[in-house]
Amino acid sequence: MSITVPTSRAVKGKPYRATLALLLAGLAVASVAASVADAAEPFTAEAMWKLKRLADPAISPDGRMAVVAVTTYDMDQNKGDADLWLVPTKSGKPRQLTSAVSGDSSPAWSPDGELIAFISKRNDDKEPQLYVIAVDGGEARRVTNVPTGVAAPKWFPDSRRLAFITQVWPELKTWPEMAARLRERADSKMTARVWDKAPFSYWDRFLDDRKTHVYSVGIEGGEPKAITLEAGHPLDAAEPDASSYDISPDGTEIAFVSDTDTTGTDPNFDVFVMPVDGGAARNLTADNPANDFAPLYSPDGRLLAFRKQVIKGFYADRARLMIYERRSQATRNLTEDWDRSADGLVWSPDSHSLFGAIDDAGTRRVYRFDVGGGTPRAITGDHSFGSLAAAGSGPVIIGLRQSFSEPPTLVSIIARTGAATKLSDFNDAALANLTQGKVESVTYKGANGEDVQMWVVYPPNFTPDRKWPLHLLLHGGPHNGMTDGYQWRWNAQVFANWGYVTAWHNFHGSSGFGQAWADSITKEWAELPYQDTIKAAEWFTAQPWIDANRMSAGGGSYGGYLATLLLGRPHPFKTLVAHAGVYDLYSQVATDDGATKGRYGEYWQDFERINRNSPHMNAANFNTPTLIIHGQLDMRVPVNNSLELFNTLQNRGVPSRLVYFPDENHWVLKPQNSVFWYQTNRQWLQQYVKPGPGEAAAAPAPAVSTQQ
């Protein structure tokens, strides 16, 4: 007989099975555990917001210390405050370095190990500015006073200068001129915005006519000097960050990413290099019509790594790890035959290899890539890792580890074995008093008879001798595969604590399962994920501990689209939740990225394909009670989608509720709004799918083991 029992961390195996004998024995154990469980608190949305959130860490040049921004949220104030903490990578207690009310972010360690640069908005700052602070403490000192604000600081090797990015008007030559234009636009009673070229928006904001460029400044302050401005190749206007540029180890050259498209409808990001002191910029990737991005110099300065896609206009195309040899100007592809996407890359201090945080079959694993070639090698197994940094001998690798049961936690990782040692305990005390359900990874047969991986989170008091309701969560993207990681917006532990078996399935199109899997839905958005969702429900129905009459489903973004799609097709769910979901694919394509060239042609060239994939075409079949949620500031999936869906359901007499947030975007990010979001979900689900254990489950037949 083969019995697999979920543990508090992710495991892979067969679904929860138990014989009658095991159940009887478990009752005795359960009575002992009950007293412990009674002392614990449920994992609620309010409890989740009490947890501290860690951002990307930076590591000291000798590898002995890490610095990380830690955000603590105040529910009454409805906001968070981020402070910098110093954490030893071997032994010792963390030490708080900053304590500003406004919040500090983006720490960067100086090459000499003496200073930490960071971004903050303090005192009379109108925009975020660059600050430095000594590692041994003291007062932080402002370095810039740029009216357009700064982001993504990086050090020059002499530890006397810093680079940063900001968005400027190239035709204005001085900072006072830029400050004057900002004031003029802010004070103007005329509020019209005008565009002659796409794109005009990004996620939750309108884009203006400024351009993103790299500047440098001395640590003592003074006038920042433009680096990329005169070359005429701006960085990404929509989402520039630290991966947009890098500085060579000798400080003489900069590598950066710029969109070479001049139409606004056919983006092509390329990697450029140019002298820091000025001169022409050279395009290293002009021969590739798809995107190249994330340049990263090796510590010895010989090599430049970057990532390359080959399918134009497909953001989920796997990124190849490319190595450019600066002396010979030759480029090599390290991962052409590897069916995963290179991501989250950092160099080993010896320049012989890189480490990456790779989306891999439902988990983010750390992989090692040898510069000499060979198959990339996974060095971690369970849990998900990201935000890597490396330094010192060994090397010392730090990063954030997380799972469905562990919020991002600072750890050190042994490169040879992948063993991780926890360095921070910011959330240990809070988590010790919270009940979290067991987590399991299962595989079932989905569309086309192909295996689909699925994460299942059980209620903390789950026993397989009773029938339980299901809440199936539908992830977004659609290519953002669900990994074993902590979710702040759709936290499965919160749903499980309400009394629902909660699951995420990595349907066709999900990242981390190979290029063919990701690309299988790019022309037809609907069919395969729909089939995978129905097959997931059928898999659960076959389990003796699931009540087939108490099943629900819901998701956001593409997950909201999939929920809306289910409305018009046969499905077994008693209620659905659609957050920021696409309802009318015509208006969605036209408003979101309609100006961008379509990979499979434009919507006016193939109405039948759009009709097959648009939920609104099946409105005559809508009968399922539905909770609809949307934020006014959402420009990724504009709010009209949810307004149209709600009105359609109301017209048809289908029980429905519209929850509208005037101050939220594609996500619900403010603490009080988030708690209300969870409360509303809970109330709605309880109305149609009663939580908690129900009638006794039929005893399962003994399972015949097929394990070796």
Feature locations, PLM:
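Non-catalytic accessory segments flanking enzyme active sites
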Residues: 58, 163-165, 187-228, 243, ...
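A flexible loop/linker signature enriched in serine peptidases of the S9 family
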Residues: 70-83, 98-104, 117-131, 139, ...
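Short substrate-entry loop that stabilizes the transition state in hydrolases
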Residues: 463-468, 473-513
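Active-site-proximal cap/loop segments of hydrolase catalytic domains
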Residues: 491, 496-497, 504-708
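Short loop/turn segments that connect beta-strands within beta-propeller blades
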Residues: 88-92, 134-138, 218-222, 275-279, ...
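Residue-level detector of Asp-centered blade-edge/turn motifs that repeat once per structural unit
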Residues: 61-62, 111-112, 157-158, 249-250, ...
